[in-house]
């Protein structure tokens, strides 16, 4: 979107706060259906971030794949889970909860320390005069493909493994 600087900044701050609230809704809501809808809202807000950074193809792919397919699959799997199986009232932490929280906290802090040190040379940024800065004249879709198969190959594969594990877990929970 070609917006003025202050309007763009206000939009990014608003989308970021809505994204954080939606993420908290995913984690903190007790009803699984509300949590799944909150996840859909988070994925929709991420696509709005892509639109605000002039990445329309990635935004459309985000809407179609994640909001349209993955979130519907998660809601479908959640609807098959009976409430009596998972409504135990024990609020005690187990060893798995502790291990999971340690792993997630370490990933969070490693991301916080890694992101500022990353060179973002391949990303197309827009300047204040709304001119797109590009090194070569290939389209955005080609740049995405080139970067996914060269620079971002390992993160792309790790994300696909995480998605595969989450889908296997959802199917396993739905069958039980």
UniProtKB/Swiss-Prot annotation:
Regarding protein family, the annotation reads: Belongs to the complex I subunit 6 family.
Protein's cellular compartments: Plastid, Chloroplast thylakoid membrane
Name listed for the protein in its UniProt record? NAD(P)H-quinone oxidoreductase subunit 6, chloroplastic
Q: Name one GO molecular function term.
A: quinone binding
**Broadest EC class assigned to this enzyme:** translocase
Q: How does it assemble?
A: NDH is composed of at least 16 different subunits, 5 of which are encoded in the nucleus.
Q: What does this protein do?
A: NDH shuttles electrons from NAD(P)H:plastoquinone, via FMN and iron-sulfur (Fe-S) centers, to quinones in the photosynthetic chain and possibly in a chloroplast respiratory chain. The immediate electron acceptor for the enzyme in this species is believed to be plastoquinone. Couples the redox reaction to proton translocation, and thus conserves the redox energy in a proton gradient.
- Can you list the disulfide-bonded cysteine pairs? none
Q: What is its main location?
A: plastid
Say which domain of life the source belongs to. Eukaryota
């Amino acid at each position: 979107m070609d917006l003025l600087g202050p309007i763009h900044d206000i939009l990014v701050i608003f989308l970021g706060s809505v994204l954080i609230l939606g993420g908290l809704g995913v984690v903190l809501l007790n009803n699984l259906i509300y949590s799944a809808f909150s996840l859909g809202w988070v994925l929709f807000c991420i696509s709005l971030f892509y639109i605000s950074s002039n990445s329309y193809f990635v935004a459309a792919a985000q809407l179609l794949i994640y909001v349209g397919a993955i979130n519907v699959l998660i809601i479908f799997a959640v609807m098959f889970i009976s409430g009596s199986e998972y409504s135990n009232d024990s609020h005690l932490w187990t060893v798995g909860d502790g291990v999971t929280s340690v792993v997630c906290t370490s990933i969070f802090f490693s991301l916080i320390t890694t992101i500022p040190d990353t060179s973002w040379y391949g990303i197309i940024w827009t300047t204040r005069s709304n001119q797109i800065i590009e090194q070569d004249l290939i389209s955005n879709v080609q740049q995405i493909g080139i970067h996914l198969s060269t620079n971002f190959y390992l993160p792309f594969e790790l994300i696909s493994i995480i998605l595969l594990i989450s889908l296997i877990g959802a199917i396993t929970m739905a069958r039980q």
